[in-house]
């Protein structure tokens, strides 16, 4: 079966990755990060998607979001990327291509894979050497979960309640889960980006049948699940 560069059903959970052209910085100061998030809020109000996790790095952006019928990912990302690029070009006098391609997207199954993807996103600043604790990085969703930092932008991960019976337990277990994924970070990244989607064998095979594509099965395996617990510690 032919392989496509993108799977874009109108409804689904997507990990979206957008990079600056030639991996150049797209955020230079706090106001740039904040402007991007403000733009995202405005677009969310118009397109009714749920944002579960995000991380804004200096030269790229990770979003983990769920789209709804009538509001495609392509519409959302086209508006978001264009609006921020216009802001940046006006502020810094930039000329030429701003983003590298349009964006990359990966469908994610609503299962442990969704949590593994969330941890990967929120560990980006740690792996980049920008901080030792993801809670210290201000431009990600980690503190929304680990510390209950308020957010007008974020919706709770659909699997949030699997982390415990109370908010305090869930926050503690979530933090332990994310930090526990550090040891698997490189292996997850290498395996993950060789595919078009992240999920179980059944999930990937259903996508192959639905979209008439081939999804790589190299190194497939479930993320470790034992660290997601509802037990008090």
Which positions does each model-derived feature cover?
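Short Pro-Cys-Gly-centered "Cys-loop" motif that presents a nucleophilic cysteine in a tight turn
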Residues: 1-53, 57, 66-233
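Short acidic-rich active-site patches of cyclic nucleotide enzymes
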Residues: 60
């Amino acid at each position: 079966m032919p392989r496509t560069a993108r799977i874009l059903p109108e409804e689904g959970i997507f990990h979206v990755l957008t990079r600056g052209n030639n991996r150049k910085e797209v955020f230079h100061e706090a106001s740039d990060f904040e402007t991007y998030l403000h733009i995202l809020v405005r677009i969310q109000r118009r397109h009714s998607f749920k944002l579960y996790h995000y991380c804004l790095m200096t030269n790229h952006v990770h979003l983990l979001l769920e789209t709804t019928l009538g509001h495609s990912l392509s519409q959302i990302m086209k508006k978001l990327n264009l609006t921020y690029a216009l802001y940046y070009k006006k502020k810094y006098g930039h000329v030429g291509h701003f983003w590298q391609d349009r964006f990359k997207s990966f469908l994610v199954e609503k299962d442990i894979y969704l949590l593994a993807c969330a941890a990967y996103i929120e560990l980006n600043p740690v792996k980049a050497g920008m901080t030792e604790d993801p809670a210290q990085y201000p431009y990600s969703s980690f503190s929304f979960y680990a510390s209950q930092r308020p957010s007008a932008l974020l919706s709770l991960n659909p699997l949030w309640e699997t982390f415990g019976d109370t908010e305090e337990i869930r926050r503690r277990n979530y933090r332990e889960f994310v930090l526990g994924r550090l040891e698997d970070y490189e292996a997850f990244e290498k395996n993950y980006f060789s595919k078009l989607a992240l999920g179980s064998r059944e999930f990937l095979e259903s996508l192959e049948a639905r979209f008439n594509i081939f999804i790589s099965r190299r190194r497939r395996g479930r993320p470790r699940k034992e660290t997601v617990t509802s037990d008090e510690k």
